[in-house]
């Protein structure tokens, strides 16, 4: 059975992600970030992991629980997609700065521009520019190797997507599970089927 573990960072959107994962043919397992360990995740042996949105900052363990450990210890062999706070956790895990966004977004739709021209499987069939819903007050900044910036927002040039140059680790600041994200379902499909 194909399993997708979703680390819930206490977010109200987590079951929207789980529903889409199920529709795409993978069995979603949702577990709160403070209710499982790396050993517990290894026992589940998921095919992939999604680290959910949530309140707070990746700089505080009480906000992200096991999420940083998942990125550091499991990302070498298990594909990971971080959404919003999960994206910020990926940035933080690999040395990027976390700072306040130039503008706070709560359910606002932005134009997202893919800036990485390499053919990434996560963005297969995705237009170079698309609309996406944003809910955040923090952003990833000062990204450097091993992370690569994949997308920015058109209106404020904030980093909207990153990936690890060697491991199957991807982050998106926007919400692919939102109906306001025009190609979000396709991005999640690609994560489940192409990464």
Curated annotation (Swiss-Prot):
Domain of life, per lineage: Archaea
UniProt-recorded name of the protein: Anthranilate synthase component 2
GO BP annotations listed: L-tryptophan biosynthetic process
Function according to Swiss-Prot or TrEMBL: Part of a heterotetrameric complex that catalyzes the two-step biosynthesis of anthranilate, an intermediate in the biosynthesis of L-tryptophan. In the first step, the glutamine-binding beta subunit (TrpG) of anthranilate synthase (AS) provides the glutamine amidotransferase activity which generates ammonia as a substrate that, along with chorismate, is used in the second step, catalyzed by the large alpha subunit of AS (TrpE) to produce anthranilate. In the absence of TrpG, TrpE can synthesize anthranilate directly from chorismate and high concentrations of ammonia.
Keyword Amino-acid biosynthesis belongs to the record: yes
Gene for this chain: trpG
Gene3D superfamilies tied to this protein: 3.40.50.880
Organism: Saccharolobus solfataricus (strain ATCC 35092 / DSM 1617 / JCM 11322 / P2)
Pathway: Amino-acid biosynthesis; L-tryptophan biosynthesis; L-tryptophan from chorismate: step 1/5
């Amino acid at each position: 059975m194909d399993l997708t573990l979703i680390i819930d960072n206490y977010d109200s959107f987590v079951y929207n992600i789980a529903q889409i994962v199920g529709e795409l043919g993978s069995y979603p397992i949702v577990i709160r970030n403070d209710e499982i360990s790396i050993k517990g995740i290894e026992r589940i042996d998921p095919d992939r992991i999604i680290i959910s949105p949530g309140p707070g900052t990746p700089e505080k363990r009480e906000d992200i629980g096991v999420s940083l450990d998942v990125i550091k210890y499991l990302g070498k062999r298990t594909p990971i997609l971080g959404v919003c706070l999960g994206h910020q956790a990926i940035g933080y895990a690999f040395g990027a700065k976390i700072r306040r966004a130039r503008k706070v977004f709560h359910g606002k739709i932005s134009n997202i521009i893919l800036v990485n021209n390499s053919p990434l499987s996560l963005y297969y069939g995705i237009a170079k520019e698309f609309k996406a819903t944003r809910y955040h007050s923090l952003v990833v900044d000062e990204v450097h190797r091993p992370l690569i910036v994949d997308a920015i927002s058109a209106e404020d040039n904030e980093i909207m997507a990153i990936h690890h140059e060697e491991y199957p680790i991807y982050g998106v600041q926007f919400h692919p599970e939102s109906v306001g994200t025009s190609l979000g379902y396709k991005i999640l499909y690609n994560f489940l089927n192409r990464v």
